[in-house]
């Protein structure tokens, strides 16, 4: 049930939020134009520290890695600490240009951006007070949209669609199957999703609100 709700929640966000514009704006925030590559390692080592006084970037020795939820890197958000941690072996791969390692770092930067820059925190402040199912749902949705934002930062929409049709790039070298599917689904459908939200869902919500207000007044 939690997985199904997470999928629905992710699609609703795709209808409401223009993630393509979000990726362009996030690049601009780091002084990049929309066509430039996303230098994840440089950003996490230098620019985030300059931008966020609460930010820390830590490389952890493989033998000391104890995060059960991630095998490569993670983002931790507290009131006075915004921390990206990465396993040492993954960090060394990123320094050598490994696409999978760089994608992992970009993914954690996306988490930072969603919470701190775009303020799309999805209840992070009240997270510990949530019931177990709600926690799973919010975590899944946040992972999904971080994956989507990362894909649009690292690759252009044109690259994703071209590679899908021509098969000229192996996205599996840096992305999982679910991440690829999510990015392609958004690139192929984001305009339709947005139009449906504006033309169908918004009028329904407004009609519902009017009906609720009418009942309240009559009552």
Tell me what each language-model feature is.
Residues 1-219:
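Active-site hotspot residues in diverse enzymes, especially metal/ion-binding acidic/histidine motifs
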